[in-house]
Amino acid sequence: MNMKKILVSALLVGAGAIGWWIYYDASQPGKYDAFAKCLEEKEVLFYGTFWCPHCRNQKAMFGKSDKYLPYIECSTADGKGQLPICNEQNISGYPTWEFADGSRETGELSLAHLAQKTGCPL
């Protein structure tokens, strides 16, 4: 009976520790939060699709700061078509970055290149 209490107590403590760690980690800012927010302030747009491996790689460069990216999803839900917003902008490859001066670059861009192109501090 004592072994059962010890096991249950250990499981509860472990579950509590895991819950605290998940909460703590989620509440911490991402490494590139300010950089991603700056891109949006500089009127940069990031066109991509959920099925594009290069788009996923580009987002992964930002880690959990990717939620602040000025991202525009171009794919229909079934992955077989392009949404009107991207069609109207003549987006033909992914990822496509559009800058305030109207210039565009397609493909995975390094964070350093984005910083240089936009003036956003990395």
Language-model features: locations:
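Positively charged n-region of N-terminal signal peptides that target proteins for export
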Residues: M1-K5
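Hydrophobic membrane-insertion alpha-helices, especially the h-region
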Residues: L7-W21
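Local sequence-structure signature of Cys/Sec-based thiol-disulfide redox active-site neighborhoods
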Residues: Y24, Q28-P70
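Structural microenvironment flanking redox-active thiols in thiol-disulfide oxidoreductases
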Residues: T76-I85
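Structural micro-motif
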Residues: P84-A100
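Non-catalytic, surface beta->alpha helical segment in thiol-disulfide oxidoreductase systems
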Residues: E98-L122
